[in-house]
Amino acid sequence: MDPALRSYHQRLRLYTPVAMGINLAASSQPLDPEGPIAVTPRPPIRPSSGKAPHPEAPRRSPNWATAGEVDVGDELIAISDERGPPRHDRPPLATSTAPSPHPRPPGYTAVVSPMALQAVDAPSLFVAWLAARWLRGASGLGASCVGLRGM
């Protein structure tokens, strides 16, 4: 076996979570859908222009956005003031009842498939790689025996 490939397989076996003594299923906490909703404060929103206002500049009225020169930060502040505090009757990532503006392809379902994903079997991939390499070499040897040159 190629020394680099042997080293790769040794490291692969060495650093898997099971080899390191970590039981991933036991370390994960079960999800509680009735649990408390975690609400974190949003970071302060600053104007997106990046420039501090000039000290002698006149203060703008709250209605100055009608001129069309509002920054992104000011737009976000206005939207958050307009919406008010967050609602606590549903989780933040719950789906709304409004239909999606983007049509879904036929056969699309939002339900997760109950079929578990299969783990990648590294030894079988290695055997397939060896078989492909052998076939490539055998075809090259056969072509050279017949008298054909490399294409």
Curated annotation (Swiss-Prot):
Keywords in alphabetical order, please: Host nucleus
- List the subcellular locations: Host nucleus, Host nucleolus
Superkingdom as given in the UniProt entry: Viruses
Enumerate composition-biased segments (Basic and acidic residues). Answer: 80-91
Query: What InterPro entries does the entry give?
Result: Herpes_US8A
UniProt keyword Metal-binding present: no
- The main location is host cell
Region annotation (Disordered) ranges: 27-107
GO annotations of cellular component type: host cell nucleolus
What protein does this entry describe?
A: US8.5 protein
Name of the coding gene: US8.5
